[in-house]
Every structure is written in structure tokens, then in C-alpha cells.
């Protein structure tokens, strides 16, 4: 069933606990310093209320308590909208390249949970999603955020995700929106790990496999969560359309 986690995952887990402790100390201080800010938000991940922090060239992007960004807040809101406690308790989850805030959420509220990654050791199993080592109809929910832009044969990976889903199951497959049209590279660009720069047309690859694809837009949610990506300068990509405004979209694919 793929390579199981080594003991290195324990040490990584201890490091994360220390990291979360320090973040918990940071939030009250940041909130005090910026107490006069007119920009105050709610974080659906950790429950924090107050001003958000800047993240690189993104304004008011980061929660100072849990450290999560726009797409994490968006994911939590959409997941909670779809899965109430009763439905979650009957849902088997496969989490690929797991985010720690979602790992905790899934483990606490869902029927069963398996985390996976190609290289990381702090997961239950290591495997390549182009060949998922589970039988057909194994899961009700697959979550893989910002993964497919790294996968050489992404169409095969999408088929594998659909294969291990049960009928009616959902796959959450967000990718970065860098252009209107996806750019696939023949080789990985120098100094980059990605094999493609995904665009809004990328969701057509999901529609070719799944019966239904619902795209959640951050503008449909209350502004108090600050889900839109607000940039301070232009995005540098390999596309001529370098000033393309990045939408924080979340596609949910139904088998």
C-alpha cells in the first residue's frame, strides 16, 4: 500500500507543535500593535478575529494565530458548507500532500483518514498519485490542493483520483490560477519544480473525467474572511499576460 511513514514523521510532528505554540504567542502581540487598523477579519480555521498579516507581496493574507492563508480559509469554509457533522462521520478521506490544519480537522471529525505524499515522511503512506495503490471505490473524499501542477502525467493522476472515489464522492483539486490558459512545459523550467502553469481552463481536465465540477468563488463568501488574493505588484510568470489577477478558486469534482 505504498511506503509507510518512517520515524522521521514523529520529529516533524514535534516541530510543528512547537511552531503552533509560537504562532499562538505571536497573534496577541500583532493584534495589540495593529489595534487601530480598520481591517479586521475572521479566520474560519482557528477562530481568530483581528487584523491579518502581509505575506510576501500579498496584502492582509495571513492569519497571525494559525498562519494560514486565503486558500486555507476558503477550503475550510467550503468543506464545512458541504459536510455537516453527521455526513463527516460517514466519510472516508484520502488527503494528498496534507496541510496540517486540515489533517487535524479530518482526523477529529471524519470516519477514517489517510494522508499521503510522494516524498514527505510525516504521512501515513508514500506513493505517486499517478498510480494510487488503493482499490476502486475506496474513499468518499479526496483532497489534493496545489498538487497537480507538479505531476508529469496529470491526466492520469486525475483518472486515478476518480478511480479510488466511490460513486457520488468528491475530489477537492485546487491549483494556482496563473493565467487564463494553462501552459504545459515539455521540461521543467530551470529553478522550478512545476511542470505546468495552470489557468482557468485547467478545470476542463476535471470535466472530462467527473460528472460534475462546481467551482467556488471567494466573492460568494463574506468579506470578513478576506479570501481574495490582493497583490501589491504584478505576478511574474512565463506568460505574456504577467499582470493577470489571480482568483482564489476552489473546484469540487463529483464522481
Regions inferred by a protein language model and the residue ranges of each:
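Conserved N-terminal segment of class I S-adenosyl-L-methionine
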Residues: 2-133, 244-252
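S-adenosyl-L-methionine-dependent methyltransferase catalytic module, highlighting the catalytic core
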Residues: 30, 34-37, 41, 152-162, ...
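Generic "edge-of-domain/loop-turn" microfeature
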Residues: 120-123, 139, 180
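Activation segment
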Residues: 122, 133-136, 151-155
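Conserved hydrophobic/aromatic "anchor" residues
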Residues: 134, 139, 210-211
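A conserved beta-strand element that flanks and buttresses the S-adenosyl-L-methionine
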Residues: 143
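A short His-aromatic
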Residues: 146-150
Amino acid at each position: 500500500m505504498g511506503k509507510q511513514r518512517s520515524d522521521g514523521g514523529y520529529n516533524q510532528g514535534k516541530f510543528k507543535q512547537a511552531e503552533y505554540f509560537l504562532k499562538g504567542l505571536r497573534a496577541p502581540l500583532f493584534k495589540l500593535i495593529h489595534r487601530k487598523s480598520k481591517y479586521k477579519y475572521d479566520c474560519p480555521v482557528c477562530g481568530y478575529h483581528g487584523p491579518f498579516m502581509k505575506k510576501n507581496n500579498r496584502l492582509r493574507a495571513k492569519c497571525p494565530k494559525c498562519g494560514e492563508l486565503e486558500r486555507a480559509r476558503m477550503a475550510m469554509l467550503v468543506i464545512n458548507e458541504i459536510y455537516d457533522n453527521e455526513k463527516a462521520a460517514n466519510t472516508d478521506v484520502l488527503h494528498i500532500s496534507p496541510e496540517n490544519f486540515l489533517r487535524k480537522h479530518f482526523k477529529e471529525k471524519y470516519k477514517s483518514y489517510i494522508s499521503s505524499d510522494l516524498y514527505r515522511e510525516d504521512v501515513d503512506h508514500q506513493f505517486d498519485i499517478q498510480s494510487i495503490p488503493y482499490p476502486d471505490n475506496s474513499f468518499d473524499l479526496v483532497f489534493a490542493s496545489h498538487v497537480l501542477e507538479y505531476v508529469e502525467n496529470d491526466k492520469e493522476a486525475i483518472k486515478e483520483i476518480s478511480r479510488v472515489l466511490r460513486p457520488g464522492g468528491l475530489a477537492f483539486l485546487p491549483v494556482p490560477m496563473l493565467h487564463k490558459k494553462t501552459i504545459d512545459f515539455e521540461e521543467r523550467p530551470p529553478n522550478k519544480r512545476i511542470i505546468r502553469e495552470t489557468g482557468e481552463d485547467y478545470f476542463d481536465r476535471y470535466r472530462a473525467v467527473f460528472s460534475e465540477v462546481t467551482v467556488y468563488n471567494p466573492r460568494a463568501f463574506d468579506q470578513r474572511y478576506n479570501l481574495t488574493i490582493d497583490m501589491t505588484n504584478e505576478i511574474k510568470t512565463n506568460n505574456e499576460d504577467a499582470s493577470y489577477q489571480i482568483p482564489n478558486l476552489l473546484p469540487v469534482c463529483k464522481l
